[in-house]
Amino acid sequence: MYIKSIVLEGFKSYAQRTEIRDFDPLFNAITGLNGSGKSNILDSICFLLGISNLSQVRASSLQDLVYKNGQAGVNKATVSITFDNSDKKNSPLGFENNDEITITRQVIVGGRNKYLINGMNASNNRVQDLFGSVGLNVNNPHFLIMQGQITKVLNMKPTEILAMIEEAAGTRMYECKKITAHKTIEKKESKLDEIRRIITEEISPTLEKLKEARASYLEYQKMTREVENLRRIYVAFQYVRAEEIKDRSTNALKEAQANKKKIFESMAENEKKVKELAQQIEETEKKNNEEFGAKLHSLEAAFSELQRVDAKVRSDLDHRKQNLNSEENRLKELIKIMQEEFKAFTSKEKEIKKIKEGLNGLQEESKKDAEALASAQQHFNAVSAGLSSNDSGQGTSLADQMMTCKNEISKAATEAKQAQMKLKYAQQELKTKQAEVKKMDGSYKEDQEAFEAIRKTKEKLQDEMKKLKYEEAEQEAHLAKKKQLSSEISSLRELCESIEAKHPYLRFEYKNPEKNWNPNCVKGLVVTLITVKDISTSKALEAVAGGKLYNIVVDTEATGKKILEKGQLKHRYTIIPLSKISANSIGHEIISLAKNLIGHREVHIAISLIDYNSELQKAMEYVFGTTLVCSSMDNAKKVTFDKRIMRKTVTLQGDIFDPQGTLSGGASSHVTPILSKLKTMRDAEDELKIKTSQLEATEKELANLKNMAEKYQHLKQQWEMKSEEAELLQTKIQQSAYHKQQEDLLALKKTIAECEETLKKTEESQRKAEEEYKALENKMKNAEAERGKEIKNAQQKLNSAKKKADDSSRKMKEKQQEVEALVLELEQLKQEQASYKQQSEAAQQAIASLKEQVSALEAEAVKTRESLKNAENELSSEKGLMEERTKDIKAKSAKIEKYREQNNELQLSINALEHDINKYQQETADASSTLDKLLKEYKWIASEKELFGQADTTYDFEANNPKETGQKLQKLLTKKEKLEKSLNMRAMNLLSEAEERYNDLMKKKRMVENDKIKILATIEELDRKKNKALHIAWEKVNKDFGSIFSMLLPGAKAMLVPSKKQNILDGLEFRVGLGDIWKENLTELSGGQRSLAALSLILAILLFKPAPIYILDEVDAALDLSHTQNIGQMLHAHFKQSQFLVVSLKDGMFNNANVLYRTKFVDGISTVSRHCQLKKKQPLSEASNNKDE
């Protein structure tokens, strides 16, 4: 198949219809100036072949292919190529019967394009398959060698060169298909994995569940039959038992009514007798009152008055005693405070004394520094006046100073002599005393050792006392704290109890309805389960909740039922079960509307104003979730009657607005809201817990301190005893003769030390005076020089003395201020001490006065008790006289009491009989009702009741124990009811459908898995064939590559070798030999040699599996004329079965072509002219033949 003609219209530079006809089947060349449209002819062929990479035809979009992008009146580009298909062996698939194939491709501005094959519309894929079947795959166009293609081949990696061989061998398409197949297998595998997962996680569990459901359904049917059988037996027994109860109750009722009538008659008789006796007693009492009544009344009045006076006196006495105890406690407190204040006062005095001592020291130091300053000033003045200063700083002449030194030397010598004499006497006296002391030191040593032992024992006891770390004041502090905490706890308890006593309905009490009852099931009253965030909203929240505030919250309706039936509740309550309760709570949209209407802070949903446990959410929504709370009546009115909201609202004052038109409110109550009181009680309870824990900790501390205090007191007692012993021994030691001798010895030793010190001082004074005398002599000799030096020294001493005097003065003033401040504090303490003293004196006076009052009241109480006792005796005596007169009344009263007791007993009997009558009536009615109900509910009773209780029948109650039957029936009904909740009635049908789907899915899964195995086996077989074909292609291409290269570059050789491990599947590389030298790398060749090598490889690949058409676009651009000539000859020699279209500008190339087409650019449009060159070449051929001959 080869190109016969090309028709271009509106394509790139070919604006008008241009037909290029009579293409040579072998070698065609196209030439022309640059820009004349040579390459556009090749582009048109690529365009028709269906190229997808438009950059290869030098366009960015299909519109670029239209002449001037459709701007010159041409709005479409058409390319039509006629192919010769006379070679049926190489014909495209499906076109074996066509001698010519005309293919047209047209693109219209806007991107629309279409294909036509022999005038019929065709799809892009059909055209691609047509060309692909004859080796013209335009999207991998190895038949198309464009400008730059050679350079691209030179830069190819080994794997890319291998890809070219694969494409030539036809295995590349297989590789693409294999990759696609592997991807498809992977996708299918992931789908299979998904199917396996669905089978494992969804379908299999579903099947298991359905099987279980089927088993449950079968069991349910069996259970239903058994329940029906047991129910018949049990109902029959109930019917028989109801008839028996009815008969028995009717007979018992008649008997009870007869007994009641008899008892009523006996009671009437007793009442008659009681009336007669009461009339007799009344007459007797009337007589007695006339005789004793007035006096007895007078005595009773006097006795009552004395009782009142006695109570008042005792009350006053108790009050005075309490006041006395209070004053005495107050006095103790004052005395304790005064003692503490006195300690502080004493401590402050000691501190002032200590600071004053420091101040005195500073004052003396300041005085000395001031005197030193005056002395330094005087010395400076004297030196400045020409005098020299002595040691005292006074200005004197050198002669006077020398005289003074002589006097001091003489004085020191005299004092030394006196001290020497005194020392000698003291030393002799010391020896004598020491000899006497040795004779009497035995008993003294014993006393001294005993004293030392006691002192050590005292120190040991003191250390042990310190280790205890016990402070006597600590226990008192803890006791005071305990007392305070006890008082506070008592107050808090009273507060809580008083609130609970005033509001008993805050307590919810019930009896556990069953054993092992879980109290957590009952949450409690709503009012006790919430906490108000802001007290100011309490009244509003109470209005919102209303009666629901005292509803009981429980976990389930079953819990509520048990409490109501068996909890023995003392009041009526409404139960809120969390499992059932629901409320139409106000949505966020409504709340937002209300807030936008009157302001965000002016309205809130009631539930947002309380805190509660999250598990109570439903109950709180039921009570507080349907009402809004507004700040005022105006706001509440706006919100309630707004057509978008229309919800119930409550104001902070408790006024209620209902959207139905009702308004509740009015005068506000001054009573504190219960929620506020409840918060107060909760706060008090929290504080009570804290105080109670603190009290326990304090008591624990006191218990610990008690043991420690006992140890401390024991050690302290021992220490005091040892202190007394030590004092006695010390007194004895001090009064002994040995001690006096020791004191004399110490005095002598002191005298000897003083004398030795005096000797040292006199020697030092004498030495200094002699040195000073010598210095003065030197000064006399150097008077002028010494004077300047003395002035300088005097100035330095003056400056130093001045600085020191200033410092000491400043320190003294600071200390004075500190003393003044402490004196003021001390004065304050004195005033407080005086105040406490006055208070204690007043308290003592009050105590004395109260004691007198108590004594007086005690005396008065004794008198009133005596008067009361006398009045009581007199009253008893009078009553005794009256009682003797009333013995007859008592006897009659006893009879009345007896008759009344009889009537009470008879009344109890009547009550019991009435209870029995009601019971029998109820039993009869219940039995009748049961019989009617059973007959109505079970129609079969009427026909089968004759068999009830009969032996050897279904209703044989001896064979079938009714009690056991009832229990068994109840268990089966419970089990059946439980089973019904989870029972799937469609399980049988669903299971069949599910099993059918499961089997179908498993069958499809196995088919897919088998197909996968077959595909993988086929791929493996094709891989082997591909490798074989690839080796054949490589060998053939390698051979042709060497042959073509040798022809293009005589004397040179070339080959393709595997890049790694002699395995061509890893890639192929160039090897070029020039003469006998093989080059390892193409970089060692010249540019022309490299181009020829690349071109040789391309042509060798083309030669392996020749395509019908080859297109070469200026491949000779980088070659010289000789190489170009060789290319033309090589094409004639090697490619005799394919059509070549070559674009070239060199004569050496296109002179070898059979047909030459020349392009020109005329008036902005490309034109083509055809030139046949066979005639030119013929003479050359003939000449060649003649020459050979």
From Swiss-Prot:
The protein's name in its UniProt record: Structural maintenance of chromosomes protein 2
Task: Name the source organism.
Answer: Gallus gallus
Which part of the chain is the SMC hinge domain?
A: 522-639
- InterPro entries associated with the record: P-loop_NTPase, RecF/RecN/SMC_N, SMC, Smc2_ABC, SMC_hinge, SMC_hinge_sf
Indicate the principal place this protein occupies in or around the cell.
nucleus
Residues annotated as binding ATP are 32-39
The gene behind this protein is SMC2
What GO molecular-function term can you cite, just one?
Answer: ATP binding
Q: State the family named in the UniProt similarity comment for this chain.
A: Belongs to the SMC family. SMC2 subfamily.
